[in-house]
């Protein structure tokens, strides 16, 4: 089996493939460890999804356990919730090492250049520097993110010619009145017209970011200047980092002996502002589908579609909710009313309690 992409989805899929007895090759295009413009924040149940407790040294020095939400009308709502806070470079590299320990062959700085599918497998053409070779694989798993080479090969029309927008992070080091243990979420269309804008600390670096479908740099500068003034930032921006994709907002799970997982499959939930849990879960479910297909001689993509049905239904439902809530500042404010927040908080508490007893593949992905 060949897994393309050494991020969360790919590393977990590869590790579980090896644990299920499959000879597995995991490919990562870039030299590892590598930075990714991702929050690196997850709820505690994420450890259950990845199947391992995260060592303390793989997490940031500062813990995040408080949330502060700011509404369009400047109402501030506070809550407490334990979160995992990590740099994706450190975390993904650790997941790579777990895969290797399970028996996976891991090659970074290695790219998939082409793949040809047949009835009994896939010919995967790979390149490492000036070395090129063909690998015959029973299955190919595309876990190569929203710029997926695998998906582009089979579904080129899923990609636009130009990116429709971007997310941008400013990394700031210095003094401030911000609380190091709080995740700040600004639900203000003037700062982010598609979801919330964010501020949080990782070790000694503040991450200040936003996203927009149009003019993302203007939104990023405006939000940073707002945060700088409101919270008395005194220091320097050490790095600016952004990400954009031409992938359309569609789900594609694969065909034949090729399965797509994580962001490459389009399993991104902008309403929740999370994708890592879907990535981890889809990686596990893809291997479960392959194992069942091998045992029953059934069509693997049909099994995989069945296993991921709840994920996809939730993404589609949440996409509609997100469009409705961002119709105007009034609809956004209403969605953040005290009643809705109380209801959401109670559901979060219930979900957390249920996740303690639910099996990994049946976990409730939060927030609801």
Predicted features along the sequence, with ranges:
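A conserved beta-strand/loop capping segment in the N-terminal third of enzymes
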Residues: 41-96
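FAD/FMN-dependent oxidoreductases across multiple families
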Residues: 113-114, 214-289
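Beta1/beta-strand and adjacent pyrophosphate-binding region of the FAD-binding site
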Residues: 1-9
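C-terminal helical "tail/cap" subdomain of flavin- and related membrane-associated enzymes
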Residues: 291-368
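Predominantly flavin-linked oxidoreductase catalytic cores and closely associated redox partners
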Residues: 6, 98-233, 266
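Glycine-rich FAD pyrophosphate-binding loop
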Residues: 6, 16-37
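A short alpha-helix-loop-beta-strand transition element characteristic
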Residues: 32-34, 50-66, 159-164, 301
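Short loop/edge segments at beta-strand edges and connector loops
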Residues: 93, 108-110, 239-241
